[in-house]
């Protein structure tokens, strides 16, 4: 047998002087340590391989072993509550074997092969099965039922089914025979290539919001289930904290959190916090619905790309079971930097700011895997992608931010000035937008209140008017404004501080139901209307400010508990009483 030997090594890029043995995007094992790699280029003379582990100690002349398979992930029960690296190696298992750092060539099974699962079979002999047909159900965690499915693209008639009971992931629990008479054994797991989207029947129109309990998002810039969002912001503006908050409280069934090139301490924080926090709907620990993929900044650069695709493949697998999945990618800029580094080592022609010319197509391949889908088994599920972008120096005109804007429909722009003024979330309402609002109007009208979107529009117009007036105030001071415009600035302050700003550490303010958000909006708009009537009668705005009513309305987010909205009546009476006393 002809050996395929390493010819050259340049960081994570390895060249082999042979082109017959390999195919494009094939997974290979490089060197005597069997480092995982992927074929990314084949020319007449050389095969180029991108290695997903550190190549320190690798020498020319060492063998490269082809596998004939693309890079794939193992899908089955046990994914949830786990923490993986970018190529689906379980970090907790590796830590038990070899400590805090991953040894090169470490090959640990992604899922526990010895654990027994309680399996309930849902098919019987003689049943016809096809791609994504559920043949077994397993309680994976207290919150999530795992549904084992036939591989897409396969079909046949069931010839053998095991009894309900306890099985490991590699036990055969069902056998079916296809139309050509070939028997296929089904265990509790399957493998799927990470760069191939899992097939669906069709995309469905987007119609439901991903409810996050964060007022600035749910009210002003909502994201839909199956939607895409970007969170761009400079250093220290709160991208990671925003994603942590969304991962904790959004109403997705499953969270996939991908830490791509960010600090390791942030992944540790997610692990520790999610074990302590309780899901408000089920009362179970949040970690029961979460899978973490940690590819921190000190891990091999090439694996950042794999971590993004691994995360979205796991998300699609749970979507096929009929779940709504949200994937947090923090941060896509680090992935783009990895593309730039490898592109430079391959001596490709750079495009804008040194990024490769194929950056937009790679970003689109990732974001287009989001969607609200009808699955092959006729269930409905969704994948929602929320990607953080880290533009250097908060420059939103750089290529990653600009190309991301082309593929996402919600844009939450984080503002350094707001962040340093301790305004959390630091989402700038002038730069941010959501294109899902027309799609979600019917849902808000039916499930919350027909007035919700109208009130939202009024709130947005108050903020827009304040922005215009602040230009005059900064030039000439607020004293030159007439009272009706001073009122706009005062009410806008109530909106900013009392509504948009949120306290992640307060028990009633960290997560706010939509009903409470609506009531808060209505109180602020009622205050605005009553004060307009008082000012229109010629009474000075100063007399209203001195009553302290604006500050009292700001504090209602803390004073009204989420489970007792009747206390909002007090604010209507107080506003009426104060306005009547001024009259």
Where are these regions (language model features)?
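P-loop NTPase nucleotide-binding/switch module
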Residues: 96-152, 156-158, 168-228, 242-245, ...
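Metallocofactor- and cofactor-centric catalytic cores in central/energy metabolism, strongly enriched
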Residues: 45-47, 69, 154-158, 232, ...
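N-terminal accessory targeting/assembly segments
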Residues: 1-103
């Amino acid at each position: 047998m002809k050996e395929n030997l390493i010819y050259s090594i340049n960081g994570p890029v390895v060249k082999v002087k042979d082109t017959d043995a390999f195919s494009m995007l094939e997974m290979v094992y490089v060197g005597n340590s069997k480092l995982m790699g992927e074929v990314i280029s084949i020319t007449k003379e050389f095969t180029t391989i991108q290695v997903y582990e550190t190549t320190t100690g690798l020498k020319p002349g060492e063998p490269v072993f082809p596998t004939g398979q693309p890079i794939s992930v193992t899908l089955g029960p046990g994914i949830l509550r786990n923490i993986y690296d970018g190529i689906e190696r379980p970090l907790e298992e590796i830590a038990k074997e070899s400590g805090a750092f991953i040894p090169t060539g470490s090959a640990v099974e992604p899922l526990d092969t010895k654990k027994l699962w309680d399996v309930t079979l849902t098919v019987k002999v003689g049943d016809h099965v096809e791609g994504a047909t559920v043949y077994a159900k397993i309680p994976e965690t207290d919150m999530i039922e795992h549904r084992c499915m036939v591989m897409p693209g396969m079909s046949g008639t069931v010839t053998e089914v095991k009894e309900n009971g306890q099985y490991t992931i590699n036990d055969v629990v069902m056998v079916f025979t296809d139309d050509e008479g070939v028997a296929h054994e089904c265990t509790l797991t399957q493998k799927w290539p990470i760069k191939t989207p899992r097939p669906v029947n069709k995309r469905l129109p987007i119609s439901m919001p991903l409810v996050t309990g964060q007022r600035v998002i749910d009210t002003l810039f909502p994201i839909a289930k199956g939607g895409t969002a970007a969170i761009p912001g400079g250093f220290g503006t709160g991208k990671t904290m925003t994603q942590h908050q969304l991962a904790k409280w959004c109403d997705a069934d499953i969270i996939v959190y991908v830490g791509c090139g960010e600090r390791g301490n942030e992944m540790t924080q997610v692990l520790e916090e999610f074990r302590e926090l309780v899901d408000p709907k089920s009362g179970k620990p949040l970690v029961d619905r979460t899978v973490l993929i940690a590819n921190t900044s000190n891990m091999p650069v090439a694996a950042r790309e794999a971590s993004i695709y691994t995360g979205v493949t796991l998300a699609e697998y749970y979507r096929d079971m009929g779940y709504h999945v949200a994937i947090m990618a923090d941060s896509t800029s680090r992935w783009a930097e990895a593309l730039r580094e490898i592109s430079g080592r391959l001596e490709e022609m750079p495009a804008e700011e040194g990024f490769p010319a194929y950056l937009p197509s790679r970003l689109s391949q990732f974001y287009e895997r989001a969607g609200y889908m009808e699955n092959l088994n006729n269930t409905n599920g969704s994948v929602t992608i929320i990607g953080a972008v880290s533009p250097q120096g908060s420059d939103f005109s750089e290529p990653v931010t600009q190309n991301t804007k082309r593929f996402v429909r919600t844009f939450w722009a984080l503002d350094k000035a707001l962040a340093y003024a301790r305004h959390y979330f630091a989402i700038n309402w002038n730069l941010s937008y959501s294109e899902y609002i027309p799609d979600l109007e019917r849902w808000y009208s039916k499930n919350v209140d027909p007035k919700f979107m109208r009130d939202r529009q009024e709130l947005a117009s108050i903020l827009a008017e304040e922005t215009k007036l602040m230009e005059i105030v900064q030039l000439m001071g607020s004293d030159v404004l007439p009272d009706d415009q001073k009122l706009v600035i005062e009410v806008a302050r109530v909106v900013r501080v009392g509504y948009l700003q949120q306290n992640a550490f307060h028990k009633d303010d960290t997560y706010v139901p939509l009903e409470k958000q609506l009531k808060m909006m209505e109180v602020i708009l009622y205050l605005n209307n009553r004060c307009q009537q008082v000012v229109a009668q010629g009474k000075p705005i100063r007399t209203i400010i001195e009553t302290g009513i604006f500050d009292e309305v700001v504090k209602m987010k803390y004073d009204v508990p989420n489970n007792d909205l009747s206390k909002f009546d007090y604010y209507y009476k107080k506003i009426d009483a104060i306005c009547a006393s001024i009259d």
